Amino acid sequence: MMRIHGIYNMNCRFCFIDKSKKYNEILEETKYFYITPTLGSLVDGYILIISKRHINSMTLLNEEELNEYKYLINKYRNKFKNIYKKYPIIFEHGTTNLNSNFSASSVVHAHTHIINYNFYDEDNLIKNTKFKIINKLEEISKNKNYILYINQNNKKYISYEFPSISQYMRMCISKELNILNKYDWHDNYFENNINLTINKIKEIGELDEENYK
């Protein structure tokens, strides 16, 4: 078991990462984050950015952490473009307010999903989730639970009035993939996709730094 540095929670699966599990392999470690594959990899090309600090959402990052977070988003957008020939989508179920009835997160420790997927019917997703466009991450409220969605064109959306369903965005993807009964990562690991993701990210290695800016 490997404990994430800084503030942590003894009962949190992201504070104590079991490196003996393939799905917890550390693909990259930075000062403030880990990059890992994940259980429930609905597609080939699915990773998480996990905060080392035990915080409830990425809105609680300090300035230095936020800068590194944005760098990693750009870095892995471009890595996915090189590997899969298209940009990924990115989302976070931010649970800033634990007293709110609105939540879509299944693990209350800040983590962001990067997925090799583009929605077929994005207009319907935006309508049903009540997404609104934002210009930058700093605009997200620190007092409300939210879903952040960044599409393949790097357009950023936020919703504070989303359907309160655990793993909501995963459910939306699974529905389009016609595997709705397999959206829950607790029961469906997709080990082959995990292995493919690990191998392809390792194979491509580091890109030119200019690609990450």
Specify the residue positions occupied by each region the protein language model found.
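HIT superfamily nucleotide-processing domains
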Residues: 1-213
